[in-house]
Amino acid sequence: MEIQIIRCLQDNYSYLIVDKAKNIACVIDPSEAKPVIKYLEDKNIHLKYILNTHHHYDHVGGNKELKEKYGASVIGYKGDKDRIPEIDILVGDQDIWHEENFQAKIFHIPGHTLGHICFYFYNEESVFTGDTLFSLGCGKIFEGTYSQMYNSLMKIKALPEKTKIYCGHEYTKQNSKFCIAHDQDNENLKVKIKLIDEKLEKNLPTIPSTIKEELECNIFLRSGTEENFSKLRDLKDNF
């Protein structure tokens, strides 16, 4: 399996997981269809599945066109069946989604939205976190509560440290400014910021991160308590 980052819209990331042996793929959160189709056509790959972490338009905007073009099945959270366009397959917390050679465990991680999920592709040691966990940050709380978001982050935090994190946006530089402002003596964070700057100078994605890196550097995962997390989230909203 190969994971390919697809840049979409202004700062979104969609992801293709490609089974190179079968020349088929699934796509995570297609913000728009065009860049996904271009990659698939350039590589002569057939799209079989569309996986959505949540219902926001910048994560499902390509569903309809991709489904019509490839006959791909759309997978999303059962509680969002009326909000995810073209949905076919409903999944819930702790389910294992397994089609072809694609296997992922589903975690329900409400907070950013009430129906947010992540896809943990355990064989690939990779988790697709949408807008819940970012590199050095976390998503804004639009529908859920502070408690829900904190507990959702704790679920992701518990994954193996070597797990790679693929999130929904390139927000890492701005997130790093907030982290260092509130964690000025964190040497691991200083090293990570240097690497982030080097990647961005070369127009490279700062993604993936890893659970280990986020445990060392992400102030939201290091907050310690729900109360501290809530205060930090409020500060970030006005940063």
From Swiss-Prot:
UniProt record, GO biological process: methylglyoxal catabolic process to D-lactate via S-lactoyl-glutathione
PANTHER family per the UniProt record, alphabetical: HYDROXYACYLGLUTATHIONE HYDROLASE, HYDROXYACYLGLUTATHIONE HYDROLASE GLOB
GO molecular function, one term: metal ion binding
Function as written in the Swiss-Prot or TrEMBL entry: Thiolesterase that catalyzes the hydrolysis of S-D-lactoyl-glutathione to form glutathione and D-lactic acid.
Gene3D superfamilies in alphabetical order: Ribonuclease Z/Hydroxyacylglutathione hydrolase-like (3.60.15.10)
Cofactor: Zn(2+)
Gene encoding the protein: gloB
Name of the protein this chain belongs to: Hydroxyacylglutathione hydrolase
Record's subunit section: Monomer.
Membership in a protein family: Belongs to the metallo-beta-lactamase superfamily. Glyoxalase II family.
Reaction catalyzed: an S-(2-hydroxyacyl)glutathione + H2O = a 2-hydroxy carboxylate + glutathione + H(+)
UniProt KW Magnesium keyword: no
Residues annotated for Zn(2+) 2 binding in this entry: D58, H59, D131, H169
Pfam family, one: Lactamase_B
Endpoints of the signal sequence: none
Annotated binding of Zn(2+) 1, by residue: H54, H56, H112, D131
Cofactor annotation comment: Binds 2 Zn(2+) ions per subunit.
Pathway membership, UniProt: Secondary metabolite metabolism; methylglyoxal degradation; (R)-lactate from methylglyoxal: step 2/2
Assigned keywords, A-Z: Hydrolase, Metal-binding, Zinc
Keyword Metal-binding included in the entry's annotation: yes
EC code(s) of this entry: 3.1.2.6
Domain of life: Bacteria
